[in-house]
Amino acid sequence: MSVDTAKSDIQAEPSTGTLENKSSKTYSDSENNSTLDVSAQVLTLDNKSRILCIADVRGELSLINSLVEETNASCVIHTGDFGFFERSSLPSISERTLRHIVQFSPLIKKLPRSKNFDYYPSNPIGDLKNSIASHPDCLLSELPQFLSQEKKFSVPVYVVWGACEDVHVLEKFRSGEYSIPNLNIVDELHSYLLQIGDMKIRLLGLGGPYVPFKLFDNGDGKGTIAGGQGTMWTTILQMGELIETAKSLLDREEARIFITHHPIGREGVLSQLATACQADLTLSAGLHFRYGASYNEFCVNHSPEHYLQKLSAARAQFMEVYDTVKAEVEKMVTPEQHHLINNVVRLVSRMPDATNSYAMNNMLPGTAFKNLWNFNLLDASFGWTVFVVENGHVQVESKSHGFNLGYRRMASRRNENYASHIPRSTSENTGTYYYANNRLVESQAQFTKNREATATPTEEEQIEGYDQEHTDELGMSRANTTEESAETHEVIEEKSGPPAAEEEPISGVAEKPSPNEEEQPAIGGKEEVDVEEVTKGTGNLELGETTTEVTILEQENAANVTRSQAQEGRRTDMQKGNDREFRQYSGEQRYERCGFHITPCNSEEEARSYFKDGTDSLITNIQIRTSLNRYKSPQAPQNVNPTNYAYVFVENQNAVSKALGSIKVPEGVRVNIMRDDSYYRQNRGWYRNNRMEGHGTGMRTNRGRGRGGRMNRMQHPRPLQSGGSVNKQSAEPTTHG
């Protein structure tokens, strides 16, 4: 059993004659009391002609002529939302539909920006309708200009109506009241034939979107078409009439194109209807995509069974609606309409039934599973598709506006800009670090740049300034620290000996080196120092006095001790740990983060409200996080309630001290000073990635606990932690509100 059995109704009346000797056949529309001719209407084109396929011009009908000129097309196929509106359509359009039309109308977008055409609910619908009605041109569509022949189509245009159309305007075209040269409406009653060289292409169409619960509702429409309040939809009578039309015009020499507004791949009933019409290609609107799509069911279904399941679901949905309204519908329809409904019901009943396991296991998808090719078209403003027919070969050309992926260029700059979002400390540890020969080396260029950019000198810079000033008083360069220590030693040795008999300046007197100095290598180019320079600023005391000796020694010792502390302060915990053979962190660049950790906290505004007396101006960045971020599993553990907390960053540790006394939080809210020592920034298994990267770090891990037991623990102690200096973020007591 095959799904292709849906073609049996059409094959029951085969046609072997050519188009020229085929007799005309008519069907009556009982509601309109008119007879419609479905005989073939032929358009003869040259070989290698081009067929332009577009969708959704939305009333900008003149765009069709522009695209025809661009693509050098011989005819046009349009798949819905054509713009069948006139001025009299405005009062009957519902508010929701009118706002949708105004939002996407290309005619209104060309107008100067004005609140009169604002489609948001803040603009009253009455004002919006008055603005559209008072405009000199019909903003809903250019159709009135084509009806008056002020504008004309340059080539034949074949259209089906879409979702946003006026059903009353369509009925005027069907009754013959309205007519536009070169405009042909393809529907369930009207089919057209394209003769391109020796190739015949039959156009079959079905207008409106497929809405299952509206299949038996005609709305304000008369006859088989349905619509109301500015919208239209497909009915079961249209589908039944289309089956009759396809049956009456069957010709084995023709290639068939089935034109719909609703994408066929999304609805199993429409897919089955295309199979019943023996279509080779289908054209549908593309749901306003920026790229066109071409596919068959074999492309989008991983197996024939999956395709049959889609048909089965569509069958169940249709039959559920039909069984609900069947009794009421049979009382209202005429015998002709009942025949059309039975055509569709018989078509759907041949689709797979999920409740029949034998049929599902033994049914085949048919040849349409691979041979029926579907095209979803672009909106006319975003692109087009062109069929080039040459000697029976159908080629496809396509153009699309596409998506702008230029924002990807910024991805490479995100890491560079990341530093600008992280508050920098004013300490000297903010340079660029890299490792060479297991030693931490600081980039001098980056270090100098950061030092110059610092407006306020740090404590270390003040120390260096004092050293430089004091060394200038001694007449030495800072680089001669060894010479300075040696000369200080000489002065101490001299004063520890017998007192001088003569009080003469040391300048110009050759001193006898001490025995210790004789053993040391001589330093060339050493300048002699005047005692007056040494004693400058100390009250011009004499060398022989003990007070002078003590003062000089205290100053020198204080300078040396302070310099040693400053040099030791520059050494980070990572450097100290590196000297002790501890594995250094070689990941992303480190930044010392200064600020507070507030929990619970749900928003930036809430975090700023805790900073009183204007201290919120010290805040440079706020990050809101949740406590469930620590878990790797996407599902939150049970018995764990997520808690939002905030990281509040400030410029430096001085800003932390200023803001600390002005933080006022309610009861139940905790404020901690963030601790971001180098130790906590290293690649620790217990600190990063939930103990999954601890191998090789010397820490206890969850690896190696099998037959061999745990890995050997590290034999050296952990690196030293910060001593709590100003430039280091140390742990401080929690501040409670």
Swiss-Prot record:
Domain of life of the organism encoding this protein: Eukaryota
Keywords assigned by UniProt, alphabetized: Phosphoprotein
Composition bias, Polar residues: 13-32, 448-457, 722-737
Biased composition (Basic residues): 702-716
Record carries keyword Phosphoprotein: yes
Biased composition (Basic and acidic residues): 486-496, 568-579
InterPro entries documented for this protein: DUF2433, Glutaminase_GtaA, Metallo-depent_PP-like
Record PTM Phosphothreonine, positions in chain: T456, T458
Keyword Phosphoprotein annotated: yes
Region feature (Disordered): 1-32, 448-523, 559-579, 691-737
GO molecular function: catalytic activity
Name of protein: Uncharacterized protein C16H5.12c
